Amino acid sequence: KGGIYKEIGLKPNMVIYGKALGNGFAISAVIGNKKVMDVAQDTFVSSTAWTERVGFAAGLGVINFHKKNNVFVHNKKIGKQIKNEWLKLAKKHKLKIEVNGLDTIINFNFLYKNKNDYLITLFTELMLKENILANNTIYISYSHKKSIVSKYLNSVDKVFVRISSFIKT
């Protein structure tokens, strides 16, 4: 279905898909409009591993998996859910935060003068005590299922209680 450029209404002359296309295996794809691709055809050479087929197989596997499981829709849904819950939990615990990012790469910041970095570090430390390695940014993936998100948000709830009490003192 394309990349994020379609979602946000851009029509780029060229798009390059890299490492994620093969889920870490060596493959990339270059697509573009006819004018750009015609020029690129005369100048573009990439042959470092062009006889190696694992990257191609991985790329096809990733594309098929994404199509079959509607990964982009899943990731956006999870990202929106977490963004909304961050805001609800912050309001519940009287914390001032702002939430930013695309639905698939989300983050929050505390809105306390000169304390954001400290509070993010505190958030990370307290989440570790909940057995979750987390900071204020999440790169959503298909692995983020309901049970994982629920556990994460329950831990955020507990951690926000502690941060709220810290700010009050």
Briefly describe each language-model feature range:
Residues K1-T169:
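Conserved N-terminal phosphate-binding loop of PLP-dependent enzymes in the Aspartate aminotransferase
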